[in-house]
Swiss-Prot record:
Residues 32-98, 217-243 are annotated as: Disordered. Belongs to the WD repeat DDB2/WDR76 family. This is DNA damage-binding protein cmr1. WD repeats lie at residues 185-226, 250-290, 297-337, 342-382, 389-428, 451-494, 497-528. The keyword Cell membrane does not apply. It holds the Pfam family WD40. One of its GO terms (biological process) is regulation of DNA damage checkpoint. SMART domains: WD40. InterPro entries: WD40/YVTN_repeat-like_dom_sf, WD40_repeat_dom_sf, WD40_rpt, WD_repeat_DNA-damage-binding. PROSITE patterns: WD_REPEATS_2, WD_REPEATS_REGION.
């Protein structure tokens, strides 16, 4: 009995401790709820007299009526195709081939004659009546807007004739009607440009990467609106219109070269990577193919085109395969086309000697500038009059009327070769020059590291300068256009506000001091 009584007392004490503990926990829970630490829990009875939290039901998902099932990838097994199925392979090959054929079709040249409406991309209709009428640059580093030639250089000039020309060329100013960033002449990167020979007004043509041809009449004046109403924001754009431009598409691939013969000012010749040379009649606004390989499947991209000043019927060209061609447009195609393989690598540029067009110069990826005489040119083993090898590839070789050649090269130099002083006009067929005689007379340091997105820099002479000093222009990676004399003296560095890209494609008007520069965005700068 004593043991039972002790056990009973112990049991009573244990139960009392449990009750005290529960009371304390309940009090702490109430205090926590009153202070907002956590919300009260709904309790339910349990067999032990303790409470358990009630489990919350999962939220109901509301189905959206307009929700479409997401497409899932399906394996070949689910589609009923065996592993490495010939059917799957054939289907993939067919899809790939169809995509390739569609891409090739876009790039195949079109041999048809085009009317204006068939070529027009944007702009107004062309009217025939309106159409006639030495710097040192750190190698490979472009420093936008940093000049390397300016007024101080002009002041230090001691030669009176040179100083006068420097002042004249440096006095050219940007066309004021529109800023350059608003004159978008072509949809894509400009590769080549030329002026119409007319001195009545500046008429500019530009060819781009995708075969588009842009035309700008820079004699147009910016229209002035009538009295403008205050707070009239809707008509703001109408009061400040862009210049009137015309964009045509005569080619399917890059237009690499443009040429207007002085005796045929109404005809523009264009050469392209689509292997064709076309003639655009500016009066009739029609385009016809003048030369192309016999088969449209022949891919022979043309890199340059030129014509002799005294012969408006013969076309000369070079290709990216290293060939040189000649074609008299008056004769039948097969009998009149003559080609020579002059290089194993790309010929990037060439030009004829204007006064003696049987001489011509080529610039090649094989690092050479070569001088040729077409009177003594073998088809089997063509031998040049002479050649000069540069450290890196030569981009272009431009002849002037004085017998001088200007080249640009990836070794960051402009080289000037004076063959006029060596008597080129009197050379007989078969005349050759030694390596020493082929060395350049002048070398000018010039940054030619254009990279992937800027068109290659090429020098271009003024065909008929108004003074005895020959001059050429070339783009500057610091967003200028540089002008040099044939002796390598810098005449000007043209820039201005609103030039937001490198005017890499720079061209002179043949006789007037007008210079245009084209950028990778299809916009142009014009100095007059």
């Amino acid at each position: 009995m004593g043991a039972d009584n002790e056990l009973s007392e112990f049991e009573k004490q244990r139960l009392a401790n449990i009750a005290e503990r529960d009371a304390l926990l309940k009090k702490l829970s109430l205090d926590a709820q009153s202070s907002g630490l956590f919300p009260p829990k709904s309790a339910r009875s349990s067999p032990g007299g303790q409470t358990k939290p009630k489990k919350k039901p999962p939220p109901k998902k509301v189905k959206k009526e307009d929700e479409h099932p997401v497409p899932r990838r399906m394996s070949s097994r689910l589609r009923g195709l065996a592993a490495d199925s010939e059917v799957a392979k054939r289907k993939a090959d067919e899809q790939y081939e169809a995509a390739q054929q569609a891409e090739r079709a876009k790039r195949v040249r079109k041999s048809d004659a085009f009317s204006f409406s068939e070529m027009l991309v944007s702009g107004q209709k062309l009217s025939g009546d309106s159409l006639i009428g030495v710097d040192v640059v750190t190698k490979g580093v472009a420093m936008p807007y940093q000049r390397t030639f300016g007024d101080e250089d002009i002041k230090k000039t001691t030669d009176k004739e040179l100083k006068a020309l420097r002042e004249e060329m440096s006095g050219l100013r940007l066309w004021e009607a529109w800023e350059p960033n608003r004159i978008k002449l072509t949809p894509e990167r400009i590769y080549t440009m030329t002026f119409h020979p007319s001195e009545a007004k500046p008429l500019i043509f530009a060819g781009d990467k995708m075969g588009n041809l842009g035309v700008l009449d820079a004699s147009q004046e910016k229209p002035t609106s009538a009295v403008k109403q205050e707070d009239d924001e809707e008509d703001a754009e109408d009061d400040d219109p862009d210049p009137v431009l015309t964009t045509l598409k005569p080619h399917t691939r890059t237009i690499s070269s443009l040429h207007i013969h002085p005796s045929k000012p109404t005809h523009l010749y264009s050469a392209s990577y689509d292997s064709s040379i076309r003639e655009l009649d500016l009066e009739k606004t029609t385009s016809v193919e003048k030369y192309a390989p016999e088969s449209t499947s022949d891919d022979i991209p043309i890199s340059g085109i030129d014509m002799a000043p005294d012969d408006p019927n013969t076309l000369y060209w070079t290709t990216l395969d290293g060939a040189f061609g000649r074609y008299d447009t008056r004769a039948s195609r097969r009998s009149a086309v003559a080609t020579w393989q002059l290089s194993e690598k790309k010929i990037g540029g060439f030009s004829l000697f204007p006064t003696h067009p049987h001489f011509f110069a080529t610039a090649s990826l094989d690092r050479t500038m070569r001088l040729w005489d077409i009177r003594k040119l073998s088809h089997d083993d063509p031998v040049p009059v002479g050649e000069h090898v540069s450290r890196l590839s030569v981009s272009h070789a431009a002849f002037n009327s004085a017998g001088q050649i200007a080249t640009s090269s990836y070794d960051d130099t402009l080289k000037i070769y004076d063959f006029g002083s060596k008597g080129i006009a009197a050379w007989e067929p078969g005349y050759t020059l030694s390596d020493a005689e082929m060395k350049p007379d002048t070398i000018v340091r010039h940054n030619c590291q254009t990279g992937r997105w800027v068109t290659i820099l090429r020098p271009q002479w003024q065909a008929n300068p108004q003074s005895s000093i020959q001059r050429f222009c070339i783009g500057n990676m610091n967003r200028f256009v540089d002008v040099y004399s044939s002796s390598g003296d810098q005449l000007a560095q043209l820039g201005g506000d609103g030039i937001t890209a490198v005017p890499a494609v720079a061209v002179f008007h043949c006789s007037t001091n007008w210079i245009a520069g084209g950028t990778a965005s299809g916009k142009i700068c014009l100095w007059m």
